[in-house]
Amino acid sequence: FDLSKRSWIKCGGVIKTFIKPRSVKEINYVLLYLNQKNINYYIIGNISNTIIRDGEINTPFINLNSLSKIKKLNNKNGLHIYSDSGVSIPVFSKYVINQGYSGTQGLYGIPGSIGGGIFMNASSFKNYLTQNIRKIIVIDSNQKMKIVRKKEANFSWRNSIFQSHKSIILGAYFYFPI
């Protein structure tokens, strides 16, 4: 898998093992195998804010872009939605706007994914992806699914708890008030 042809900034080497699971169940199978074999791995999404070295790369990469559903939960007192981590931020932003809500218009130009945006607390024009987040669904370092509440995520400028704790962000619940 040639990263220089897929990354946002058109650089990076050739990944020998590129894994693109289509479901949480498949992610768990992949993690079980890699952990049993004591193989390190990288999680990637849109490869838009990541610089990866040139040359051949032996470490497996797990791409979560196939987790790409947005689900409207209800409209009671505002818009409640769930987004998978592989949804692109522009698609997410447009979805919220098309539902008649604001708060994401400044995010439209960010080329990343929801998972990466949560990981780094992405923002643009004073719109933070995480400002309307309620909870995040992750697979923790023990391979258990876990809910992380917004307060627990310790969001700050370009930072979150996920940068210091090995978790895989699967998706998040958002609320946009009327």
PLM features: what roles do these ranges have?
Residues 1-2, 88, 128, 149:
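Short, solvent-exposed coil/turn linker segments
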Residues 2-114:
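Anion-binding (especially nucleotide phosphate/pyrophosphate-binding) glycine-rich loop
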Residues 77-83, 99, 118-120, 141-145, ...:
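Low-complexity, flexible helical/coil segments
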Residues 102, 132, 153:
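Short beta-strand or tight-loop elements
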Residues 152-161:
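Flexible, small-/acidic-enriched active-site or ligand-binding loops
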Residues 176-178:
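Oxyanion-binding "anion nests"
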